[in-house]
Amino acid sequence: MSSVPAPREYFLDSIRAWLMLLGIPFHISLIYSTHSWHVNSATPSWWLTLFNDFIHAFRMQVFFVISGYFSYMLFLRYPLKRWWKVRVERVGIPMLTAIPLLTLPQFILLQYVKEKTENWPTLSAYEKYNTLAWELISHLWFLLVLVILTTVSIGIFTWFQKRQETSKPRPAAISLAKLSLIFFLLGVAYAAIRRIIFIVYPAILSDGMFNFIVMQTLFYVPFFILGALAFIHPDLKARFTTPSRGCTLGAAVAFIAYLLNQRYGSGDAWMYETESVITMVMGLWMVNVVFSLGHRLLNFQSARVTYFVNASLFIYLVHHPLTLFFGAYITPHISSNLIGFLCGLIFVMGIALILYEIHLRIPLLKFLFSGKPPVKQESRAAIG
């Protein structure tokens, strides 16, 4: 355990917050995209589809790198049991709170919007369970994955710490080219695992809990570990905060490949396996693009930025049902996709900020949506 706090990484705090907030335009643009979602506009927009695909291709990979970075930083600061307890509470309590307060009402809303209420009694017990798994976890899936990664990383982080204590500090002698090869091979390995599952027991890939607990965790664990390694090796972090033309061009080419795979790939063939390889390497390259831009533009302290850093998780949690409400009841009355998209941003962000301010004034809600217990103020009054 280290008693010396690490310097504040303002740009990483900011990037993490903006990646969370990108979930709002991501889901609103999904309404107007060619992708089939819970609610869609009458006519899709090609440019909002492109915008949606771009966000989807890299956002969570970069997010999990930052999560791994801060997780290991806190691992060195706290005793093991306290570290695990704090980390799990910070993500687990908001997730468990959001299920009854947000995703359950959202599920009920969608049942009426999609006129599925009459079909519910006809479903089998497993179909009901699986439907609830998908719908109640919903956009909270990354919190569940973070709980799993935090638990799994206990052994990995302990091993990293012992290596740091027993060996002399040395540079992480690995270039971005070598990292790209490693992540390409990791993408191929993930694709192979998925293909084997598809051949042996394809039905399990449609199981919500299996998807969240196994498949999503397997895909994002390399990015989580990479974040921890970036904290351990400052030279590795420097590779990500230094602009790389190769990474920028590589990410652009990977995104084109991603779009072509979306356009011409088939789910019954190799589309999902190909996508996993593409998004694995694109995610790595976008870490460089996002970190270098963030380091140059966001590495400063600002009260306004700090406000959104603190508010980002709450806003992300509440934005999803607000977006679905907007798509179901307001989108049909707006003929222009552009105007609808902009109105959606204003509607969702405006209400989310109002709800955020309200919840700050209710201690129980503030605890439930942050996982942070209230700080006890010691009385300064003197007796006698």
UniProtKB/Swiss-Prot annotation:
Pathway the protein acts in: Glycan metabolism; osmoregulated periplasmic glucan (OPG) biosynthesis
Q: Name one GO biological process term.
A: glucan biosynthetic process
What topology does the record note for this protein and the membrane?
Multi-pass membrane protein
Entry superkingdom: Bacteria
Subcellular localization is given as: Cell membrane
EC primary class: transferase
InterPro entries reported for this sequence: Acyl_transf_3_dom, Glucan_succinyl_AcylTrfase, Glucans_biosynth_C
Q: Please provide, alphabetically and separated by semicolons, the GO molecular function terms listed in this UniProt record.
A: acyltransferase activity, transferring groups other than amino-acyl groups; transferase activity, transferring one-carbon groups
Q: Kindly report the protein's main subcellular placement as a broad class.
A: membrane
Keyword terms of this UniProt record? Acyltransferase, Cell membrane, Membrane, Transferase, Transmembrane, Transmembrane helix
User: Which Enzyme Commission number(s) are listed?
Assistant: 2.1.-.-
Q: Which residues cross the membrane?
A: 17-37, 54-74, 91-111, 140-160, 173-193, 212-232, 240-260, 274-294, 311-331, 338-358
User: Which GO cellular component does the record give, naming just one?
Assistant: plasma membrane
> What family does the database annotate?
Belongs to the acyltransferase 3 family. OpgC subfamily.
Q: What does this protein do?
A: Necessary for the succinyl substitution of periplasmic glucans. Could catalyze the transfer of succinyl residues from the cytoplasmic side of the membrane to the nascent glucan backbones on the periplasmic side of the membrane.
Q: Which NCBIfam families match?
A: PRK03854.1
PANTHER family for this protein: BLR4337 PROTEIN, GLUCANS BIOSYNTHESIS PROTEIN C
Query: What protein am I looking at?
Result: Glucans biosynthesis protein C
Origin species: Salmonella heidelberg (strain SL476)
Q: What is the lineage of its organism?
A: Bacteria, Pseudomonadati, Pseudomonadota, Gammaproteobacteria, Enterobacterales
- Gene behind the chain: mdoC
